[in-house]
Amino acid sequence: MNTRTMLLSLALTLMALPLASAASPGTFEGSGDTMSALQRGTYMSFVGIGLAFVATAFFLFMERNDVHRDLRPALGVGVMIVGIAGFQYNLMAESYLFDGSIPTDFRYADWFSTVPLMALCFPLVAGRKAYTSKRLFDLPGMSVPGLIMIGAFFMIASGYLGQVELDAAIKAGTDPASIHWYWFAQGMLGYLGVIVIAGTPFTGAYGLDDTKVTDPSLRTALSRMRKLILVGWLIYPVGYVLGAMGSGVEEMVLAYNLADLVNKVGFVIIVWHGVRNAESSRALAHDMEAGFHTLAHAEDKQDDAPSDDLLAIAAMSRGETVEEPEDDL
C-alpha cells in the first residue's frame, strides 16, 4: 500500500465515523417524528453521496501533480466541484434530518458554485488554442469561459426562483402558482445555452474548435463530457416536474441527489481519465522523440539534425498533423 492510498484510507475512516453516528437516529430531530422507510433512504442518500463526493475530491487532489501543468487547472477545478458538493451535502443532510424539509438554499448554493465550474472544465480541457474568435456583443469577458459560465449562472438562477415558488406551495399544501413554470422554462434556455457553447457529441460547438485539440485523449474526454451533460443534466428537470406534479418531497429530492451523483462524480472522473491519458501520451511521445533523435545522431554523427521522416513520426506520436511533402517531379 503506497502513501497516497494510506492517507486516503485514513481520511475516509475519520470522516466515516461522525457520519455513521449521525446516521443512527430514526427520527427527525426537530419534531421527534419517526422517519418512514422512504425518508430514511432519502436521508442516507445525503450522507452516502456526500461521502462519495469527499472521497472523489481526495482522489483527484492526490492525482493532480501527476498530470502536465497545462492540464492541472482542469483537475483542480474537478477537486473544487466535488469538494464543494461534499461540504454542501453534509449541510443538506443536517437540514433534512431536523424536520424533513427540502434543503433548497443549501442545494442551490452548491449548484451556484459547482455548475459554472463544470461548464468551465470544457475550455480548460480543450485548451486556449481551441477557443473560437466568436464573442457576444464584443463585450469584455464574453470569450468562451465567460459565455459558458454566464449561461450556467442564468440556468441556476432561473431554476432557483422556480424552486422557491414550488417549495412554498408544497409546504402550504396548495397548487404552485403558474409563474414557476416560467422560471423552469427560462432555466431550460440557460441549459440550451451551455449546450450550444460547449457543443454536443453530434454537433459543433459555438465556442470551441475540436480540430485544434491535438491530443485524441482530450477529444474523447470532451465528447464524453458533452454526452454526460446532454443526458445527465436532464435528470434535474425530471425531479422538478415530479415535485410540481405532487409526487412528494422525497421523490424530488432523490431525483436531485441521483442527478448530482451521476453528473458530478461521473463528470470529474471523465476529466481525470482524459488528462491522465493525455499525460501518458505526452510522456510516450517525449520518449519516442528522444529515441528518434538518438538514432538519427548515431546514424550520422556529422549531422546533428534528425531526418524529416523521423521528425514526422515523432510529430505523429504527439497527435499532430503532418503534411505530405510535395513531389519534386
Positions of the model-derived regions?
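N-terminal secretory/membrane targeting signals
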Residues: M1-A23
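Hydrophobic transmembrane alpha-helical segments in integral membrane proteins
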Residues: S24-F53
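Extracellular-loop-to-transmembrane junctions of the mid-late helices
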Residues: M44-V47, D167-P201
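Alpha-helical transmembrane segments in multipass membrane proteins, preferentially the mid-helix core
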Residues: V54-L60, C121, A157-S158, G190-P216, ...
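Internal transmembrane alpha-helix with an interfacial aromatic "cap," most often the third helix
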Residues: A57-E63, Y89-D99, Y108-I148, F153-D167
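A generic, lipid-embedded transmembrane alpha helix
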Residues: G76-S95
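Membrane-helix boundary/juxtamembrane motif in polytopic membrane proteins
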Residues: P176-G187, F202-V231
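C-terminal transmembrane-bundle signature of multipass membrane proteins
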Residues: V196-G204, S223-T321
